[in-house]
């Protein structure tokens, strides 16, 4: 690897050399890595950066010289699988450094979030399990005496050995990215509200008292996430997203707030440290409070389809960065969601005659063509609001809400004649789930009997069947409109994602992301054993607002979204008052 390269452009930190800053600023920004690997978690000291990287089949931890002069994968850590065998940890996440910087706190990333935490020597050797605790995310205190970790909606505190575990705080959503202040007195963490599509920064004292949200009425507080203290404890650096004025682009920026007040609240708004066009996140502060390290991201999502004759994935529309692409019934038009930006577009099947249909601060997702090709239904994801379905003319116009009823709405399904629209809920509470059908003639919405507790509805093309999922995403239910009866169709070994009916309404296909190799599976009406029809293999899939997406092209081939984003480590010089 070569040396670091300066990143050109204006940042809020630009100033006259030698002038004392009145507020935190970023000076030089330099690119440290140039390897092209996807990156997630990052921890750093002043000489080394440890970053979780995605190769073709695994998540590994790379150690990178802070000046970009060298890069090496850390050894595979041995850990006891049983009393008589040894194994190697895979899919690693770098979560933190020990006080003496000789050990890494790591976990194995799993979709369930029930990860074990391990202390592993940087120089190689046997890893040590930290008690029997499990969770999503964890962090050591600066003195190494305690471990804080999040599991579901609960923040826990334990000693360094993972013992003496006790509940510290119970939040209203899932908790992650906990970080001790350098003096160990308080812990800041992120709470995610999945239904509202928001995140929020919180603080709690080490003894569990004085829990409160940060940032007051700041406009971007609903996207704030994942912070890191400067080593001197004077500032807390975090990430939050904002729309670029007069564009469809959303940029994740780094911000700073002072920690001078004991209650963690500040009269002034956070100070903007980066302004784009690149997004920055996963920030880690150096020991001297003079440098930050972060992952810089330039998102690019390529919709591809599987070409069986060539046994490879090929672009659907070359040069287009998008997700959630759907063809009109006649195959002549497409609708899709732009990446970045999350806006709804319509275009010819070859990408020409492109027309932007939505604007504003919200994201669009899951567009669905009406049978006559005149209208597109889509879901609007606005932070702090329930997800709602809208209809918009394919030629452009003003979006119209599908229903004024409260609660979330998602997964629009048109009836074959276009006179009705079926949709479901997005809600983690099974008691609040149901499936409804809107009649455009009467403007009445009715709940499908027996659909309580079900979501992700899929109407068969002939109108006879409805497939829907139980909250565990593995139990697939089937409703027969002719017999007006529900029955359990299958219980999958992995999660059922993005189900799609066959054109003849006799089979349902779904994306299996968990059961071994990612694959497309098919189950026929009247049968209960899914069969594998396509292995996705090592395709690097883009993670969008609703996870990884799949669908079917006009020719029946399978479509996926390949992640072609650039993710590299950057060093940002920090200038403090």
PLM features: residue spans?
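Cytosolic linker/terminal segments flanking nucleotidyl-cyclase catalytic modules
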Residues: 1-30, 37
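Predominantly a core beta-strand signature of beta-propeller blades
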Residues: 28-29, 69-72, 125-128, 163-167, ...
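Terminal hydrophobic membrane-targeting helix
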Residues: 30-31, 39-43, 49-65, 69-75
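Conserved beta-propeller blade repeats
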Residues: 36-52, 78-108, 129-150, 155, ...
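Structural motif
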Residues: 57-62, 112-118, 153-156, 196-202, ...
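Short loop/turn segments that connect beta-strands within beta-propeller blades
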Residues: 65-69, 121-125, 159-163, 205-209, ...
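Residue-level "micro-hotspots" composed of small/polar
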Residues: 259, 263, 536-541, 562, ...
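Ankyrin-repeat and related helical/solenoid repeat scaffolds used for protein-protein interactions
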Residues: 502-538
């Amino acid at each position: 690897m070569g040396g670091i390269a300066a990143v050109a452009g204006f940042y809020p930190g630009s100033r006259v050399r030698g002038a004392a800053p009145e507020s935190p600023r970023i000076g030089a920004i330099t690119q440290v890595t140039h390897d092209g690997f996807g990156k997630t978690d990052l921890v750093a000291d002043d000489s080394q950066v440890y970053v979780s990287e995605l190769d073709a089949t695994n998540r590994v931890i790379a150690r990178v010289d802070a000046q970009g002069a060298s890069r090496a994968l850390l050894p595979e850590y041995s850990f006891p699988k049983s009393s008589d065998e040894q194994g190697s940890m895979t899919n690693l996440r770098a979560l933190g450094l020990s006080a003496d910087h000789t050990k890494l706190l790591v976990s194995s990333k799993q979709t369930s979030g029930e990860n074990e935490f391990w202390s592993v020597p940087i120089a190689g050797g046997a890893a040590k399990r930290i008690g029997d605790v499990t969770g999503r995310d964890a962090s050591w205190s600066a003195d190494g005496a305690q471990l804080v970790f999040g599991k579901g909606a609960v923040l826990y505190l334990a000693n360094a050995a993972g013992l003496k575990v006790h509940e510290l705080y119970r939040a209203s959503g899932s908790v992650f990215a906990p970080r001790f202040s350098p003096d160990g007195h308080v812990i800041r963490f992120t709470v995610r509200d999945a239904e509202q599509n928001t995140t929020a920064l919180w603080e709690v004292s080490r003894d569990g008292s004085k829990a409160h949200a940060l940032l007051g009425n700041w406009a971007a507080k609903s996207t704030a996430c994942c912070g890191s203290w400067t080593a001197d404890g004077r500032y807390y650096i975090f990430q939050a997203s904002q729309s670029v004025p007069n564009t469809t682009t959303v940029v994740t920026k780094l911000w700073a707030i002072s920690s001078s007040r004991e209650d963690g609240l500040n009269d002034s708004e956070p100070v903007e440290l980066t302004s784009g066009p690149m997004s920055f996140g996963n920030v880690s502060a150096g020991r001297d409070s003079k440098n930050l390290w972060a992952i810089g991201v330039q998102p690019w999502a390529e919709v591809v389809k599987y070409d069986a004759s060539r046994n490879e994935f090929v672009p659907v529309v070359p040069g287009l960065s998008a997700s959630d692409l759907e063809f009109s019934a006649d195959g002549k038009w497409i609708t899709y969601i732009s990446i970045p930006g999350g806006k709804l577009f319509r275009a010819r099947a070859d990408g020409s005659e492109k027309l932007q249909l939505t604007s504003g601060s919200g994201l669009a997702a899951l567009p669905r063509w009406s049978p006559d090709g005149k209208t597109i239904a889509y879901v609007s994801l606005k932070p702090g609001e329930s997800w709602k379905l809208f209809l918009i003319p394919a030629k452009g116009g003003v979006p119209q809400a599908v229903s004024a009823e409260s609660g979330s709405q998602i997964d629009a399904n048109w009836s074959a004649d276009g006179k009705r629209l079926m949709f479901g809920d997005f809600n983690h509470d099974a008691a609040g789930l149901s499936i409804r059908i809107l009649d455009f003639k009467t403007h009445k919405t009715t709940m499908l009997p027996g659909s309580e507790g079900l979501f992700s509805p899929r109407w068969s093309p002939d109108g006879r069947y409805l497939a829907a999922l139980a909250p565990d995403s593995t139990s697939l239910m089937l409703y027969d409109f002719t017999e007006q009866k529900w029955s359990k169709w299958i219980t999958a070994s992995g999660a059922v994602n993005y189900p799609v009916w066959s054109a003849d309404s006799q089979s349902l296909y779904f994306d299996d992301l968990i059961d071994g190799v990612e694959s497309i599976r098919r189950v026929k009406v009247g049968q209960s054993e899914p069969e594998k029809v396509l292995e996705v293999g090592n395709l690097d899939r883009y993670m969008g607002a609703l996870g990884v997406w799949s669908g079917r092209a006009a020719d029946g081939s399978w479509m996926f979204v390949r992640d072609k984003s650039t993710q590299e480590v950057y060093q940002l010089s920090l200038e403090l008052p």
